A protein has these predicted regions:
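ABC-type ATPase nucleotide-binding domains, specifically the catalytic core motifs of the NBD
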Residues: 15-17, 108-120, 130-132
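Conserved ABC transporter NBD signature motif
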Residues: 63-71
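Conserved ABC ATPase "signature" region
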Residues: 70-71, 119-136
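Short coil-to-helix segment of the ABC ATPase nucleotide-binding domain corresponding to the Q-loop/switch region
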Residues: 101-108
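Conserved ABC ATPase signature
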Residues: 141-145, 149-151
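Conserved catalytic motifs of ABC-family nucleotide-binding domains
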Residues: 162
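Catalytic Walker B motif of ABC-type/P-loop ATPase nucleotide-binding domains
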Residues: 166-169
Length: 223
């Protein structure tokens, strides 16, 4: 079976007026199906750029990226959009929930975009159960929830299209330590159920939950 994610000699250079900035410098690595890994590094090291590349939100300057054996540079914009929508779930530090929609509607939003259908309440409730959000909150709006509860909603939204890969950018960065630990416990449960999870973090306590850590400094993998 092909790795779910594979980088081969990937370089990303951002041209600026002050001069080119190399965000990723000849990066090569693989992520197998079902792995739970963390990406660590100091601010500006390239770890968020790496996550962006994994999510097909940007293209490399050179090198190749494969998602489940498919080389992204061979795919059209429409194919890349479908790949992101169908196979990749995104979880961010800032929850990016819609304040005027209730929790069921927020969770259902990616599915509504996919099929242009009405809210699939049954599916939304299924994933909300999976992230252990109390049922009495389902008709509330995000601003009525705590930070930890909002992050659970964001995770449920990422799960609703049953992605192969979950990409998480500092998922506990906006939470207190106790709430952050509960979110990482949830991630561990999702991993045990077969999810491939990649977490960008600066927090070594978060990295302890994962199976292995990729450390990146100045755009290069150092361990």
């Amino acid at each position: 079976m092909a790795p779910v994610i594979q980088f081969k000699d990937v370089v990303k250079i951002y041209p600026l007026k002050s001069g080119d900035v190399t965000a990723l410098d000849h990066i090569s690595f693989e992520v197998d199906h079902g792995e739970f890994i963390s990406i660590m590094g100091p601010s500006g090291s390239g770890k968020s750029t790496l996550l962006t590349m994994m999510g097909c939100l940007d293209t490399p300057t050179s090198g190749d990226i494969f998602i489940s054996g498919l080389r992204t540079r061979d795919m059209s914009d429409t194919e890349l959009t479908n790949l992101r929508r169908d196979r990749i779930g995104f979880i961010f530090q800032y929850f990016n929930l819609f304040p005027l929609l209730n929790i069921i509607e927020n969770v259902s939003f990616p599915q509504m975009l996919k099929s242009q259908a009405q809210v699939d309440e049954k599916k939304a409730i299924e994933v909300l159960h999976a992230v252990q959000l109390d049922e009495h909150l389902y008709t509330h709006t995000p601003l009525e929830l705590s930070g930890g509860q909002q992050q659970r909603v964001a995770i449920a939204r990422a799960l609703i299209n049953e992605p192969d890969i979950l990409l998480c950018d500092e998922p506990t960065g906006n939470l207190d330590s106790k709430t952050g630990a509960s979110i990482m416990d949830l991630m561990t449960d999702l991993h045990k159920n077969g999810s491939t999870i990649i977490v960008v973090t600066h927090d070594p306590h978060v990295a302890e939950y994962t199976e292995r850590t990729i450390r990146i400094v100045d755009g290069r993998i150092v361990s």
